[in-house]
A protein has these predicted regions:
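A short core secondary-structure module
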Residues: 156, 164-165, 169-186
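Amphipathic, small/basic residue-rich leader segments at the start of a protein or domain
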Residues: 1-106, 124-127, 131-134
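Short, solvent-exposed loop/turn elements at beta->coil junctions and helix N-caps
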Residues: 77, 144-148, 173-174
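Hydrophobic, small-residue-rich alpha-helical packing segments that form membrane-like cores
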Residues: 148-151, 166
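N-terminal glycine-rich flavin-associated loop
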Residues: 104-123, 149
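Adenylate-forming
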Residues: 112-116, 142, 183-186
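A short, Trp-centered hydrophobic/proline-enriched beta-strand micro-motif
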Residues: 135-143
Length: 186
């Protein structure tokens, strides 16, 4: 067996710490899974259709984050737990199994946040990351354009420098989560 395959197999086996963590997640879900809110919960972030649903999901996301089960691989100084991604994967797996509500800020959590962590300035990290995790600052994506959809190679929108700022020129046909977002990733 080659070293790479051996390492890959070992990385898929939980150690005692991860196993204990999984048990803790399952126990937390058992005691914190919210009661029926009286309306149909969305299965994806694109199904969030009202302020009532948004408020419910925002409260849930805050609870998940404040309990330490969201942003686990994000740096501590910006609201994360500073742990390995495997712990976040375990928490996500158990939440999916238990069919708990979604953490709806998917564009912030999956795109904007990691990009800011990897390439952002300290100011940007301080300004944006914690709000993404708590659900206070919702992000949307602004890629789709008339006649091009989300074909990033055909985007006509341009950012033009104007002194210390950039002016964004272009048009969009829909903006996923745009009706609730505070920030947009382009």
């Amino acid at each position: 067996m080659s070293n790479n395959i051996h390492q890959e197999l070992n990385s898929n086996v939980e150690d005692a710490e991860q196993s204990d963590f999984r048990k803790g997640v399952v126990d937390w879900i058992k005691h914190n899974n919210p009661k029926d809110p009286g309306f149909l919960l969305p299965q994806t972030f694109m199904e969030v259709g009202s302020e009532q649903v948004l408020d419910f999901l925002r409260e849930w996301q805050y609870k998940v984050w404040s309990s330490g089960y969201l942003g686990m691989a994000w740096p501590r100084e910006y609201g994360g737990q500073g742990m390995s991604r495997q712990f976040q994967q375990i928490a996500d797996e158990e939440m999916k199994k238990a069919r708990v509500p979604i953490c709806f800020n998917v564009i912030g959590l999956g795109w904007a946040g990691p990009l800011i962590i990897d390439t952002g300035s300290d100011f940007e990290k301080q300004t944006y990351l914690k709000g993404i995790l708590t659900g206070d600052d919702i992000w949307c994506q602004g890629f789709s354009e008339p006649n091009h959809g989300s074909d990033l190679g055909s985007i006509q929108t341009r950012a033009e420098r104007d002194g210390d700022e950039y002016i964004i020129n272009g048009s969009k046909i829909w903006t996923t989560m745009g009706n609730f977002a505070k920030y947009m990733i382009l």
